[in-house]
């Protein structure tokens, strides 16, 4: 029997049950026991659903209450001292992630950053020279017992020790976290021994760092690690998000029992690696895309897999390319999608069914079944809705001048100072304000047809008026309309641009209880009508202060959507860039003097290997500049980025040529600014001065210290003051309190820094 397995399954539930259970517990409305019961129910449901769909080896240990890296930190007892309070439990985990929990003292949350090149996030492990590890939280072992009690075929899932250390950060200078490997391996040996004692045969040990360009000392660390971990259980070395062919010499020397390859992200590595695999190894072929919603063309996969089956026999497994965490749960809930469009898609459960089909086929099943399943994708190739001549013609007619502003930044900066007359250290926010229950109910009533368009418009205008009044009372210098009309910064534009499909239950986890519902790019993209103009004009009519027009940039819309698989990402980005360009021109024509084009995802789109970086950055920068360039010098273009390590992309960030960039820096204590200082970044910067992901309200002294730190690296006349990110997920009480502190801190420092 050909083993069919997934690397992980979405935790949140088809209707976001985990999200609502977490938030209820955090609000004190339910008990920890009730939350734990919800998690157990979801795990059982998901295991059984995968089994029914055709998966015959189930992932156990992929469930996480916040993220799997944080879960690993608790497993090996790598909990920062400030978050400890009695025994390690769920509240310990939430204190690390959120800065506070229903029990225990509040403390600064751990730093959060992107999981490789995805829109998923993890809490960065913190390491010190005297770090000690021990067997800690028992969640993994408890879940193995749960699955075995149900009689299910178990494959334990464990983040590998080298990748775990790689994903962390030293909290003191003078040592490398790699020095901690030997101590960590002792605990990993205990983990594997305990899993073996529970009757676990296979452990999926994830080492995604192998897809990166690793320093030699980190590459060699794998040899030491897997020499010591060999024995108790069979180890499936699991890689994803890119090719690991460049690590062939290391990988084929490791004492493991199999290798998983992401053959969606890097199909070419199959020919490079398979001939060199040890004769006894399993090959797990990751052929079903775990990061997209498109139905797999199984008929195209069949010949390659059949040849592998003939060569490897039972040593060939079929799998998702990566965890299905990055895919929505169940397509059968999407009753409102056009049936033809729906026939192009497969969500997590349907991908399990695809694996089952492949497994059956490889074990002698009928090719006709595979061919029939793939037919909707064949039909799509000739669908007239997919390729639009007008869009293609406009792209073909672009010239170099379409990607450039009228003048260089120094000329623009003077024109903007003369026009805007802002004070030193201008204060602003990133864009969104709290999405209250009142706003959500208003949107739900409108979508359900229980209120008409005029009532909805009046309701949103009331929210905008409230946001403007609150900002003026706080004393902010540059205002925003608050985005009450937007359920999501990408989905909103996906609904209004032609070329996207919007799902109802296509939710995926971003971090913790935060879920996003990416639109799906299905055809060529264009803008039938203005998308933000009327709301922004209304907001500006209420105040004499400048109101920023708020747009999401083309690279972020692309990265935070499920992309097409039949055209390049560059092609889609430029199509979106043209649509945003038209919106920018309309906003400027309406008198909006500051326009923000958010690109928080530009770093996450970066390929994992340096050799591929420049090609991506070239088209990403061009797409942004295409969207931002149709304005006069006195119109100020802002952009926002978050969770970014800017060292790799600082030249590209400068090449965007935005007049002002706001970035997320408070959790890293302004360390991210070092890249801008070393590069001598020429334009204006707004480093975030407080962490919006934590509900804690910062002190004025804390913010003043961060502004002073920033002013040592960026001249004060090019410095803005703002929160780290948008405030959509916060409540108004904490939002107003934090912004008042921020404004007061700024006013206190203006004379000092003048």
UniProtKB/Swiss-Prot annotation:
Its cofactor is Zn(2+). Zn(2+) binds at residues 640, 642, 664, 725. L-homocysteine binds at residues 430-432, 483, 598. CDD domains: CIMS_C_terminal_like (cd03311), CIMS_N_terminal_like (cd03312). Pathway: Amino-acid biosynthesis; L-methionine biosynthesis via de novo pathway; L-methionine from L-homocysteine (MetE route): step 1/1. L-methionine binds at residues 430-432, 483, 598. One of its GO terms (biological process) is methionine biosynthetic process. 5-methyltetrahydropteroyltri-L-glutamate binds at residues 16-19, 114, 514-515, 560, 604. InterPro entries: Cbl-indep_Met_Synth_N (IPR013215), Cobalamin-indep_Met_synthase (IPR006276), Met_Synth_C/arc (IPR002629), UROD/MetE-like_sf (IPR038071). Keywords: Amino-acid biosynthesis, Metal-binding, Methionine biosynthesis, Methyltransferase, Repeat, Transferase, Zinc. The active site is at 693 (proton donor). Pfam families: Meth_synt_1 (PF08267), Meth_synt_2 (PF01717). GO terms for molecular function: 5-methyltetrahydropteroyltriglutamate-homocysteine S-methyltransferase activity; zinc ion binding. Binds 1 zinc ion per subunit. It catalyses: 5-methyltetrahydropteroyltri-L-glutamate + L-homocysteine = tetrahydropteroyltri-L-glutamate + L-methionine. Belongs to the vitamin-B12 independent methionine synthase family. Catalyzes the transfer of a methyl group from 5-methyltetrahydrofolate to homocysteine resulting in methionine formation. NCBIfam families: met_syn_B12ind, PRK05222.1. This is 5-methyltetrahydropteroyltriglutamate--homocysteine methyltransferase. The gene is metE.
């Amino acid at each position: 029997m050909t083993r069919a397995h997934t690397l992980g399954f979405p935790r949140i539930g088809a209707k976001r049950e985990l999200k609502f259970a977490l938030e209820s517990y955090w609000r004190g409305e339910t008990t920890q026991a009730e939350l734990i019961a919800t998690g157990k129910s979801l795990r059982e449901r998901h295991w059984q659903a995968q089994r029914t769909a055709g998966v015959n080896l189930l992932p156990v240990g992929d469930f996480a209450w916040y993220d799997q890296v944080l879960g690993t930190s608790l497993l090996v007892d790598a909990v920062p001292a400030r978050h400890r309070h009695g025994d390690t439990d769920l509240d310990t985990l939430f204190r690390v992630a959120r800065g506070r929990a229903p029990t225990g003292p509040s403390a600064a949350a751990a730093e959060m950053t992107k999981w490789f090149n995805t829109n998923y996030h993890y809490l960065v492990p913190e390491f010190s020279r005297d770090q000690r590890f021990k067997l800690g939280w028992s969640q993994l072992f408890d879940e193995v017992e749960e699955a075995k009690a149900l009689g299910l075929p178990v494959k334990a899932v464990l983040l590998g020790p080298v990748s775990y250390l790689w994903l962390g950060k030293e909290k003191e200078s003078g040592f490398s976290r790699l020095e901690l490997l030997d101590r960590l391996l002792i605990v990993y040996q205990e983990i594997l021994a305990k899993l073996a004692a529970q009757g676990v045969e296979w452990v999926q040990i994830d080492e995604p760092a192998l897809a990166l360009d690793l320093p030699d000392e980190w590459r060699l660390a794998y040899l030491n690690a897997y020499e010591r971990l060999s024995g108790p259980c069979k180890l499936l070395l699991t890689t994803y998000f890119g090719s690991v062919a460049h690590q062939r010499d290391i990988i084929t020397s490791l004492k493991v029992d199999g290798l998983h390859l992401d053959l969606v992200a890097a199909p070419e590595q199959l020919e490079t690696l398979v001939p060199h695999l040890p004769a006894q190894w399993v090959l797990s072929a990751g052929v079903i895309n775990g990061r997209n919603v498109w139905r797999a063309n199984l008929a195209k996969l069949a010949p390659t897999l059949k040849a592998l089956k003939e060569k490897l026999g039972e040593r060939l497994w079929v799998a998702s390319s990566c965890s299905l965490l990055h895919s929505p749960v169940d397509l059968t809930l999407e009753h409102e999608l056009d049936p033809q469009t729906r026939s192009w898609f497969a969500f997590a459960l349907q991908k399990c069914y695809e694996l089952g089909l492949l497994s059956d086929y490889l074990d002698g099943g009928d090719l006709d079944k595979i061919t029939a399943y793939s037919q909707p994708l064949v039909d799509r190739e000739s669908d007239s809705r997919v390729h639009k001549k007008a869009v293609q013609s406009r792209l073909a007619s672009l010239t170099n001048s379409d990607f450039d502003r009228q003048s260089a930044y120094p000329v623009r900066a003077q024109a903007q100072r003369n026009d805007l007359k802002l004070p030193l250290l201008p204060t602003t926010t990133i864009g969104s304000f709290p999405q209250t229950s009142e706003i959500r109910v208003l949107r739900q009533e409108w979508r359900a047809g229980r209120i008409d368009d005029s009532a909805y418009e009046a309701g949103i205008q009331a929210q905008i008026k409230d946001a403007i009044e609150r900002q003026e009372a706080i004393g902010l210098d540059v205002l925003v309309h608050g985005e009450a009309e937007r359920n999501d910064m990408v989905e909103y534009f996906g609904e209004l641009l032609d070329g996207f499909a919007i799902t109802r239950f296509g939710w995926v986890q971003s971090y913790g209880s935060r879920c996003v519902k990416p639109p799906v790019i299905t055809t060529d993209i264009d803008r039938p009508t203005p998308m933000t103009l009327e709301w922004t004009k209304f907001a500006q009519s209420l105040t004499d202060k400048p109101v920023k027009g708020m747009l999401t940039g083309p690279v972020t819309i692309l990265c935070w959507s499920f992309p097409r698989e039949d055209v390049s990402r560059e092609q889609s980005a430029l199509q979106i860039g043209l649509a945003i360009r038209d919106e920018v021109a309309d906003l400027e024509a309406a008198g909006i003097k500051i326009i923000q084009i958010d690109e928080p995802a530009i770093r996450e789109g970066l390929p994992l290997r340096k050799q591929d970086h420049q090609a991506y950055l070239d088209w990403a920068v061009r797409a942004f500049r295409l969207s931002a360039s149709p304005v006069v010098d006195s119109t100020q273009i802002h952009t926002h980025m978050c969770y970014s390590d800017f060292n790799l992309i600082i030249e590209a960030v400068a090449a965007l040529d935005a007049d002002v960039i706001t970035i997320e820096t408070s959790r890293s204590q302004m360390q991210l600014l070092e890249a801008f200082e070393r590069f001598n970044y020429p334009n204006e910067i707004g480093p975030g001065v407080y962490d919006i992901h934590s509900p804690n309200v910062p002190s004025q002294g804390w913010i003043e210290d961060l502004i002073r730190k920033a002013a040592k690296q960026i001249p004060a006349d090019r410095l803005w003051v703002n929160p780290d990110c948008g405030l959509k997920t916060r409540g108004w009480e904490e939002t107003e309190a934090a912004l008042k502190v921020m404004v007061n801190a700024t006013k206190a420092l203006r004379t000092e820094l003048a």
